Amino acid sequence: MRIAGAQIPVTLDIKENTKTIKKSIDWAVENNCHSLVTPEASLSGYDSYFDEDTLVNALAEIEEYIAEKQIGLCLGTLWKEKEEIGEVRRNQIRFYDNLGKILGVTNKTYLVNQDNGCLAHELDDKGIQVHNLRCQKVQKVGKQQINAVGLICNDLWGNGWPGKPSLSNLALQSGLCDLFVHSTNGARGNPHDEIYNKWHDAHLLMISQATQIPIITVDNTCHMNGHPYDGPTSSESGVTVDGKWVTKVPRLGTQHFYYDF
């Protein structure tokens, strides 16, 4: 299954983010990809108090666009869900097939300060979430489906977080996961950049090696608050397999890549 990744700017302007994601969809279509992965909060922007009406309209536009273009999407966005307990804000990866049909949703488990206002995934009650990514009606070269587990930012970096289960280990133990889809949006431009770079790189390499499950990961090119930034992303975007990077894109500005799983 050919999956593309988009290293793109994530601003607080939902309409601008929509345009950016559509351009990435176009790139993925031009490169005969089955699906596309976007960074954490790539549609909504990384602000829990997003404009709800604007976001609802933007998501509808994206869903219509992927159906028109016949490509799947793993969309990082904040979202307000209607659940049994009421309306709840979540940090999500929304998985779609190439007809614009939603296949499932991963909610972020290990929240950070930037997620203020969002509710964490109830791991104890609902367990790890596995999604079957697939293409409908359109035959493209290669595998047409794959079982994926979404890991949102700290859900991967927080592997082995004190007192908390490792989500990658839970996915491995399930025996159902073929791929980790990692959407992230990390801090950058601070005194900890060097050590954070090593931390992120080590996790992406070691988890892919220890679990023998590939990882596709994409990061935001802006600051977490959506402000422009001309330095490197907080982590590398690309694919790791068995402890090695098998794709390579610069960590500056908008970049796209794909890999055949």
What does each of the following model-derived ranges do?
Residues 7-12:
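Short polar catalytic/cofactor-binding loops
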Residues 55-75, 157-255:
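CN hydrolase (nitrilase-like) catalytic-core segments centered on the catalytic cysteine
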Residues 1-4:
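Extreme N-terminal starter segment of soluble prokaryotic enzymes
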Residues 84-175, 193-199, 260-261:
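Active-site catalytic loop in hydrolytic enzyme cores
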Residues 34-35, 146-148, 178-179:
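Structural motif
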Residues 18-32, 165-174:
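Short amphipathic alpha-helices and their capping/turn segments at secondary-structure boundaries
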Residues 6, 106, 218, 249, ...:
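Hydrophobic residues at beta-strand termini and immediately following loops
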Residues 14, 23-104, 114, 186-213:
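Cys-nucleophile CN-hydrolase/nitrilase-fold catalytic domain and related Cys-dependent amidase chemistry
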